[in-house]
Amino acid sequence: MWLEILNNVRSRKKAIKFPKTFQKSPDEVIETVTPVKKMNKVFGKSLRIRQVDAGSCNACEWECNMLTNPIYDVQRFGVDFVPSPRHADVILATGPVSRQMELALKKTYIAMPEPKLVISCGDCALDGGIYKGSYATRDGVSNVLPVNCHIPGCPPPPKTIVKEL
């Protein structure tokens, strides 16, 4: 990479070439869906997300973290991840909900202002995934909170997460 930067400086190129492994540019990767007018009135064309890891293997968190990189850049759509549930519109919950995280997830939901949305991300959050039936889990977010939307996949790719948001 350093050699490529040095060559760009010598040839006075303005930017590093986009990787050849990608078939499309970042703007073509994300197909935006026209938002519903009612949702625009409620959320003001922006969405604040509180991500909660409820006992997952962290694969879904990695994919959610990729949403903020330059390729997907969800902030250009008005989507922000917030550290406090008091500023959040949506809980993005991942994992099968371990017994230790059940109370924390409920407290996060209670701390959110109205209107509240819950999105379960990944197959573990839907029905427990590979942890289904374990004594240590609640077999999905829907057994703890009312879920409004589910993002399928193990883990779901960032493009799918962006489409659902």
Stretch-by-stretch model annotation:
Residues 126-142:
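Glycine-rich, charge-decorated loop segments at or immediately adjacent to ligand/cofactor-binding or catalytic sites
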Residues 89-90, 117:
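Structural motif
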Residues 78-87:
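Short acidic low-complexity segments
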Residues 55, 96-98, 124, 156:
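Short glycine-rich anion-binding loops that position phosphate/pyrophosphate groups of nucleotides
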